[in-house]
């Protein structure tokens, strides 16, 4: 039985997340997903969705066999417990595969690190891009609403 581990924040689920997990699942028999803890996310803005909700959403996805929250103190602890054969990285994850491979070996974790290619057939494959688009549309709509209200009041 080949165990695959995928990791990530999974904030505001989008087609890129699903692609990453589907491609990861194809590499083995079981897909374990480690969802990053809110407190451990330092390389990008804090998630919009709390960790417990992100965990529930990821666990509900078809390719996922098991989903767990990461460890608050030791990122390798869940990996040691799962004992994966393969660890996948998403196309935009900040880990360097070779550096991660060496760190795993130092922890006596014998897993192959595989980078999953980018999913490009969807315009929204980044949570950050989705948040930007929501902010842009909200701004446009509020301006449109203000202009309409001004016209109705005879101010324009």
Curated annotation (Swiss-Prot):
Binding residues for ATP: 9-10, 14-17, 92, 119
A Pfam family the protein falls into: CTP_transf_like
Pathway of action: Cofactor biosynthesis; FAD biosynthesis; FAD from FMN: step 1/1
MF annotations from Gene Ontology: ATP binding; FMN adenylyltransferase activity
GO biological process, one term: FAD biosynthetic process
Catalysed reactions, as listed in the record: FMN + ATP + H(+) = FAD + diphosphate
EC top class named in words: transferase
SUPFAM superfamilies in alphabetical order: Nucleotidylyl transferase (SSF52374)
Entry keyword set: ATP-binding, FAD, Flavoprotein, FMN, Nucleotide-binding, Nucleotidyltransferase, Transferase
Enzyme Commission code: 2.7.7.2
Cofactors demanded by this protein: a divalent metal cation
Function according to Swiss-Prot or TrEMBL: Catalyzes the transfer of the AMP portion of ATP to flavin mononucleotide (FMN) to produce flavin adenine dinucleotide (FAD) coenzyme.
Oligomeric form and interacting partners: Homodimer.
Sequence similarity: Belongs to the archaeal FAD synthase family.
Protein's name according to its UniProt entry: FAD synthase
Organism for this UniProt entry: Methanospirillum hungatei JF-1 (strain ATCC 27890 / DSM 864 / NBRC 100397 / JF-1)
